[in-house]
Amino acid sequence: MNFIQDLRLLLKSRYPIILINTREEERLEYIIKNQLFCLDNEKVYCWDFVDGYTSNPNDNGYAKRNPLLALEFIEKLDTPYLNLFILKDFDSFFNDLGLIRKLRNLSQIIKTQSKNIIIVSCKVNIPYTLSDVITIVDLPLPNLSEIKKEITRLSIALGIVLDIELVNNLAKSCQGLSVERIRKTITKTIAQYGQLDSRSLPIIIEEKRQLINQTRLLEFYPYKKATEDIGGLDALKSWLKKRSRSFSKQSFNYGIPTPKGLLLVGIQGTGKSLTAKAIANDWTLPLLRLDIGKLFGGLVGESESRMREMVTIAEGLSPCVLWIDEIDKAFSNLYSQGDSGTSARVFGTFITWLSEKTTPVFVVATANTIQNLPSEMLRKGRFDEIFFLDLPNNEERELIFQIHLARIRPKSWQNYNIKQLSLLCNKFSGAEIEQAIVESMHTAFSEEREFSTEDIKIALEQFIPLAYTDKEQVESLQAWAGNGRARNASL
């Protein structure tokens, strides 16, 4: 079901009070007045704290700055019409006990009348005493079809001719933006270039990046890495290559279900985060990085609200890759009593969304340990696959040396004795190998000469890898993966 069908069903089923979570008040009003309540025997009343009721000339300004009076108006209104009352930001008054009582009483009264209340809010924070009275619905961001219609409407209004391919490209770039933000961005582009063309795309993407970063939950992450930049992990690469077209229309028509994502468990520095970036690059999808710690807020209900906001943004930008780094740290205190169950509720919401989502949001979660991972997360069906990224073997270490040296010395990397170096760094991670190369460069640069194989050898000999400093943890993780609990990322 889509939003309109869901809302129509709730109204027909006599759900008295519905809270719609959205920042797009204007778009919501348009949908309600033009697609839901558009008949002569249907009336829509809009109220806000500053202007009171505004939709009906006979009641303009009524109940201004008086939310209780606004509810009394609903109770006393006696008309033969179907009535819908849109109350904006009404949740701001949920700390008023008298108003809460009035809402509960009113919900019982209007069940038998042709009245419904819609509360419009950009956050969801309902007191427990109203949880059985108010039903929450999210207004999703405009889909591709809606965006195309809006871009076409704007171009016609501004006298600009667009071909179908450009409309499609602009619409894809605008995914994740509200209708109002799309209008502003398109207008900004026209003001700069005098028309809409391929030059518009970077402006739209930058607008999207700024908007997403403003949420402080998600970061529109730049990526310049491909799977070719990762040394080894051939089993994981093969798995990803097989699914590179999983979000295409052809895949959908073939009947392939939308991929859920991956859980990458492994020792630090083995390429988990790099893999997330490479997936987005290879699949040409936007990469969103979630700081899952920022989901947790200090106010009651705030964490759950942030989780819903994250889902709305990610799904609005789909198809995309959602990268959740070090997810094991976020839910380490899942069953503790110190946060009044907030972690458990947020985790439950996340797991439910992960299991049931149908939108093409490919989740890549990384974890350095398994001790803190809840067993529910490791259950089959949460992710498409769980991969274990172990310390690289000798062949993979050679490839890692080659990748790094070819990047910094593209013309002379073959002068380095890579085979000898890879034998000297058993139990080194890829990140540790890179750090040893950087250290050798510092040494040579300070002596005003080119760094050599010998410099790298000395750096490796002085380096103590994590496999020795945290031996117990590394061996524990390897034993866990060795028992068949995860698929090895290397062949």
Curated annotation (Swiss-Prot):
Keywords: ATP-binding, Chloroplast, Nucleotide-binding, Plastid. This is Uncharacterized AAA domain-containing protein ycf46. Belongs to the AAA ATPase family. Highly divergent. GO terms for cellular component: chloroplast. SMART domains: AAA (SM00382). Gene3D superfamilies: 1.10.8.60, P-loop containing nucleotide triphosphate hydrolases. SUPFAM superfamilies: P-loop containing nucleoside triphosphate hydrolases. InterPro entries: AAA+_ATPase (IPR003593), AAA_domain_protein (IPR052381), ATPase_AAA_core (IPR003959), P-loop_NTPase (IPR027417).
